[in-house]
């Protein structure tokens, strides 16, 4: 994630944000498809059955989570991006509770508090006054969207059992991520 945020902040000066995301996932797909097209073709019926689920995973995990941090990097700081993106576990727990009616337990709450404390400690280098100087921008809203999208991707990936093996499913998710980004790449 750290390298993604650095590229998001620095790379957008040279390449438009959606282009970065589109070419990232298109490259992944193009490099992997020669090795995985046969299993996909053999399971074309499964592909058709799982089409919308795969598209949703590609949209949330590659499309939104791929483009939104790069868009955010145009107007916010890496520190803000890191702080906001670390909220993903909170959204995972809350959305899992809402969508799948999972109970939130004390250990999860303590884990989230410790996680956030650790992140804030690292970001502030132990100087809590740095956190009080955070200035929020429109880029932070884009990052919040990425964090929520990552949470949705994570809980659906965990709870949806595919008939494709993990790597083949990843290739298909990358493909749908590229497809979901393509119309925005054109503009």
Report residues per predicted region.
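Glycine-/small-residue-enriched transmembrane alpha-helix faces in small-molecule transporters
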Residues: 1-22, 132-159, 179-183
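Specific transmembrane alpha-helical segments of multi-pass solute transporters/efflux pumps
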Residues: 1-5, 33-85, 121
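Membrane-interface helix termini and inter-helical loops of multi-pass transporters
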Residues: 6-17, 44, 71-74, 78, ...
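Helix-helix packing/entry segments at the starts of transmembrane helices
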Residues: 21-23, 62, 66, 79-87, ...
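C-terminal transmembrane-helix exit sites in multi-pass transporters
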Residues: 31-40, 88-113
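Hydrophobic transmembrane alpha-helices of multi-pass small-molecule transport proteins
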Residues: 32, 104-126, 175, 181
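Residue-level signature of transmembrane alpha-helical cores of multipass secondary-active transporters
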Residues: 53-58, 82, 112, 139-147, ...
């Amino acid at each position: 994630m750290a390298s993604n945020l650095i590229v998001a902040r620095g790379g957008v000066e040279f390449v438009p944000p959606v282009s970065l995301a589109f070419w990232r996932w298109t490259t992944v797909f193009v490099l992997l498809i020669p090795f995985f097209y046969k299993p996909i073709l053999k399971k074309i019926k499964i592909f058709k059955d799982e089409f919308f689920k795969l598209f949703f995973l590609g949209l949330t995990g590659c499309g939104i989570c791929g483009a939104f941090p790069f868009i955010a990097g145009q107007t916010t700081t890496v520190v803000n991006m890191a702080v906001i993106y670390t909220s993903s576990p909170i959204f995972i727990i809350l959305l899992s509770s809402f969508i799948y009616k999972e109970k939130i337990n004390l250990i999860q709450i303590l884990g989230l508090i410790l996680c956030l404390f650790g992140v804030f400690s690292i970001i502030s280098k132990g100087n809590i006054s740095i956190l009080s100087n955070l200035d929020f921008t429109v880029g932070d809203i884009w990052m919040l969207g990425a964090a929520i999208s990552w949470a949705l991707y994570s809980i659906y990936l965990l709870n949806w059992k595919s008939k494709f093996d993990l790597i083949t499913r990843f290739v298909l998710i990358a493909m749908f991520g590229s497809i979901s980004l393509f119309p925005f790449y054109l503009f």
